[in-house]
Amino acid sequence: GVVENLLSITRLNDGRLKFKFTDQLLDEVIAESLRHISRKHDDYKIVTDCEELVLARMDVRLIMQVLVNLVDNAIKYTPPGSVICIRGTKTDGKAQISVEDNGPGIPEEMKSHIFEMFYTGKTTVADSQRSLGLGLALCHSIIEAHEGTLVLTDHDPHGCNFTFTLPLSEVT
């Protein structure tokens, strides 16, 4: 939870987190990550759409943590019955993974703050506090350490789309 995220961010930011980079197939990493989704998600339809044989360079433990975090957020902040789609593609010379949901989305005024460490915003789902900060700050730091980007865009017609990139493997 929160303590693990905070410890990970601290280790990441001061260079104590050791990375073990290996070449991994996107579809396998996505499938394995879904086995770690903690909450019961029978009420949610989780769909994967992944290009075959996309090999990316990553620390697989950390990238799985990013994926689990993004999918958990999508489950937590969308009503039961929502569809969550995880896509893996090769785009512009990079591996790209996106987690899309068709929930209420994130209000415009919150978007510029969601990667801040302790930011919490209000959402419409039972008007609960959306404590995005720590998890998303950690995800952002992990992806940056992989020389990638993590961005939030709106998912048409409503919902969120978190997309991150990773370097492709340099396999001949």
Q: Predicted segment positions?
A:
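Short helix-loop "hinge" at the ATP-lid/N-box region of the Bergerat-fold HATPase_c
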Residues: 74-75
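Conserved catalytic submotifs in the C-terminal HATPase_c
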Residues: 20-25, 45-55
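Acidic ATP/Mg2+-coordinating residue in the GHKL
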Residues: 101
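Short conserved segment of the HATPase_c
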Residues: 106-118
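Short alpha-helical Gxxx[C/S/T] motif in the catalytic ATP-binding
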Residues: 135, 139
